[in-house]
Amino acid sequence: MRSVALTLCAIIAGYLLVSNLQNVFSPEVCTLVITGESIRINGCNLSPAHFRAISHLKVLQIHL
């Protein structure tokens, strides 16, 4: 019973370690921020089709 618990803990710890290492070595994060004044795109690899689609986006408008 104890060896099963230790094995499970080792598997979980290994998964967390690998997951964190993947995040460190692949920091490419694509962020799209839409506000009431602008649209900002950071860290994205964009194709011409993406540029055409993004050109039709509008700023966020909320009518209260």
From Swiss-Prot:
The chain crosses the membrane at residues 5-27. Keywords: Host endoplasmic reticulum, Host membrane, Membrane, Transmembrane, Transmembrane helix, Transport, Viral movement protein. Residues 28-64 are cytoplasmic. It is found in: Host endoplasmic reticulum membrane. Residues 1-4 are lumenal. Belongs to the Tymovirales TGBp3 protein family. Plays a role in viral cell-to-cell propagation, by facilitating genome transport to neighboring plant cells through plasmosdesmata. May induce the formation of granular vesicles derived from the Endoplasmic reticulum, which align on actin filaments. This is Movement protein TGBp3.
